[in-house]
């Protein structure tokens, strides 16, 4: 009897270890399943808010920015002036219609540029930016980068390109606390996003790298130069027709 009790005690640790191992093995599968369901849900559901908006709100609250307010209103892609999507593609990701989430040529160019000691340049595609802004937190850790790649693969797999672009122009930050085309059009020019002009659209695209530093409503010299360049690029790409599904 005493021996049986000793055997039971010796058996418990291996059983606990096996249970722990099962959880360790199951956790990645559970996360993968949950993330797939997330992405599938947002293929048809328009999110009322994104992680980047939550992050900015918490930042403002933590720093005591009493006057901060968040502006966002969803608009379907067909309710936004066609000049805006082509402007952001011309500015941010000209291979968007043809790549599968990652622009390897742009990544190589950015790596060479950064290796020469220039100001650090990114090579994130629109798909990667959607993954980051909708599902993840801000940061540069390898964990976040890995999750960004995973979500990028999922949205490219499960969402049509038009949905990715629609999500992008609705969650992108165009000014401090101003997210999406509709909020930007209202705050800057007092109009609906459907009435944005090509110049206004190009201005919004021009401030995307640093929307808290540059002002689309009162553009300085840099934004004006960038706006003109974006308009030229958009014309060279073929205008809004460049983004039409084949």
Curated annotation (Swiss-Prot):
Catalyzed reactions: [GlcNAc-(1->4)-Mur2Ac(oyl-L-Ala-gamma-D-Glu-L-Lys-D-Ala-D-Ala)](n)-di-trans,octa-cis-undecaprenyl diphosphate + beta-D-GlcNAc-(1->4)-Mur2Ac(oyl-L-Ala-gamma-D-Glu-L-Lys-D-Ala-D-Ala)-di-trans,octa-cis-undecaprenyl diphosphate = [GlcNAc-(1->4)-Mur2Ac(oyl-L-Ala-gamma-D-Glu-L-Lys-D-Ala-D-Ala)](n+1)-di-trans,octa-cis-undecaprenyl diphosphate + di-trans,octa-cis-undecaprenyl diphosphate + H(+)
Keyword tRNA-binding: no
Membrane protein topology class: Single-pass membrane protein
Major site of localization recorded for this protein: membrane
GO MF annotations in UniProt: pentosyltransferase activity; peptidoglycan glycosyltransferase activity
Enzyme superclass (EC): transferase
Top-level taxon of origin: Bacteria
Organism, scientific name: Xanthomonas campestris pv. campestris (strain ATCC 33913 / DSM 3586 / NCPPB 528 / LMG 568 / P 25)
NCBIfam families noted in UniProt: mono_pep_trsgly
Keyword annotations: Cell inner membrane, Cell membrane, Cell shape, Cell wall biogenesis/degradation, Glycosyltransferase, Membrane, Peptidoglycan synthesis, Transferase, Transmembrane, Transmembrane helix
A GO term from the CC aspect: plasma membrane
PANTHER family in the record: BIOSYNTHETIC PEPTIDOGLYCAN TRANSGLYCOSYLASE, MONOFUNCTIONAL BIOSYNTHETIC PEPTIDOGLYCAN TRANSGLYCOSYLASE
Signal peptide start-end: none
Subcellular location: Cell inner membrane
EC number: 2.4.99.28
Membership in a protein family: Belongs to the glycosyltransferase 51 family.
UniProt cross-references to InterPro entries, sorted A to Z: Glyco_trans_51 (IPR001264), Lysozyme-like_dom_sf (IPR023346), PBP_transglycosylase (IPR036950), Pep_trsgly (IPR011812)
Stretches that traverse the bilayer: 20-42
Role summary: Peptidoglycan polymerase that catalyzes glycan chain elongation from lipid-linked precursors.
Pathway annotation: Cell wall biogenesis; peptidoglycan biosynthesis
Biological processes annotated in GO: cell wall organization; peptidoglycan biosynthetic process; regulation of cell shape
Protein name: Biosynthetic peptidoglycan transglycosylase
